[in-house]
């Protein structure tokens, strides 16, 4: 009998009526096989809980904050199970811990360390629809953890991999993956399918998907459908082998999508004596402070000195500066610059690795749009530019036009 893992986001569960609608969709799916449903917190519940915590403390204890935030998904979990039972279905709700999700002890951004699906399998064998709280797990010391914002997607894909499900279906307030953010680019087009490699790059650089969920799907080969919970539309299928299935239209430009991400900040450490170990001396303390560094550029200066520039999330800028100011002294400089109000804009496509001219085409389009490029980074299938945040919408539109992404495949 087929097994499907579904995930429903907070916007799909924001009211009792929406929860009833989701329950009806889950119940209909069970007529064709077994169903496990992963749920996010209702609507803006997580933000409300964060606001409650901030009313108690400016810096809430991470362990206790995880205990608090995990209750949002538990509410949804219980309510969806109640709604299913009201429809006459057999259903059971499980917390992340009850579902066997074991994590590291990094509160607020824990990683899945293991998953024992025995309890879920027992409930499925009893004929139950299993509703699992997303976003959470438990450590070996039995402490509740959360996996980071948006990680209910990861919970769903991890469960699908562990249960060897036929596929994972992620239902949200959008009807699939688009060639760009439709809020920025009105001409953006929904993709019928996309490969894991391209989707991972898009998600990592701003597309509305949890990058770790895509990575999990790629490693364990779990097909992922992204579709609307409000409309009966086909959505976008993310799966292995989609990357190179180029149609005539795709061969025309080989760029599959534009990703954008706001709230980026830049830090530059100037005039560092160029010697072995300076990069490690700077970035190891940042890693120890649990600060993620993205783009790194090293520029050779004069008289044996170098400038190191890197980007972080704007929310991490102040903490980063605390670390960098201390390290800079050890590196023999007191010249540290910072810039906020930046954004990333990227073009992504597996076909770019085999064809020249994409960088120049991108840079020309941005130049013609009056957009200054502050930093550049690339992978085999992606080119990313750092631009001013208030120009990111224009950047996305001119690139979408330059690569003719509005045209059907």
What are the roles of these predicted feature ranges?
Residues 77-83, 113-114, 151-154, 229-231, ...:
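Short, charged low-complexity intrinsically disordered segments located at boundaries
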Residues 133, 202-263:
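Phosphate/diphosphate-binding glycine-rich loops and adjacent basic-rich segments that engage nucleotide
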Residues 167-171, 224-226, 294, 375:
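Short hydrophobic alpha-helical runs that function as membrane-insertion/retention elements
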Residues 42, 174-176, 220-224, 228-233, ...:
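Glycine-rich beta-alpha junction loops
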Residues 1-214, 218, 311, 387-388, ...:
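Nucleotide/pyrophosphate-binding catalytic subdomain
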Residues 237-409:
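A conserved regulatory-domain signal marking ACT and ACT-like small-molecule sensing domains
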Residues 89, 165, 222, 291, ...:
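Short glycine/serine/threonine/alanine-rich loop segments
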Residues 168, 214, 221-223, 323-326:
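N-terminal short leaders/motifs
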